[in-house]
């Protein structure tokens, strides 16, 4: 789950699956069953990725600073990724990670999950 702290920007969630396929709003359903929520262009998010039967390997969770609707952005954008495994089950776990993106076009890996 990707969220951010500035409501005038468009951030994108990108998840690179172990196969190398990237799940994002322009490729919202992957061959391995991953899916992503519609692109959120207003507000603070969230954008979400879900996979029910995760393949073994490492998933990279990245954020991309796509657009800014302000005339000038001086402070950048803080993003937060919450990763849930075994969601809704007794053994559910949650990890959070944050990152800072300075300007439009920036992209960074915020978290990695090995399954």
Task: State each model region's role.
Residues 1-115:
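Intrinsic-disorder/low-complexity signal
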């Amino acid at each position: 789950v990707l969220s951010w702290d500035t409501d005038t920007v468009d951030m994108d969630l990108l998840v690179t699956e172990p196969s190398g396929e990237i799940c994002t709003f322009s490729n919202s359903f992957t061959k391995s069953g991953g899916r992503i929520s519609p692109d959120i262009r207003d507000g603070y998010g969230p954008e979400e990725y879900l996979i029910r039967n995760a393949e073994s390997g490492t998933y990279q969770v990245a954020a991309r600073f796509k657009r800014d609707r302000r005339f000038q952005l001086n402070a950048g954008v803080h993003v937060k990724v919450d990763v849930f495994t075994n969601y809704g089950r007794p053994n559910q776990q949650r990890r959070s990670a944050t990152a800072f993106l300075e300007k439009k076009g920036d992209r960074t890996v915020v978290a990695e999950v090995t399954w």
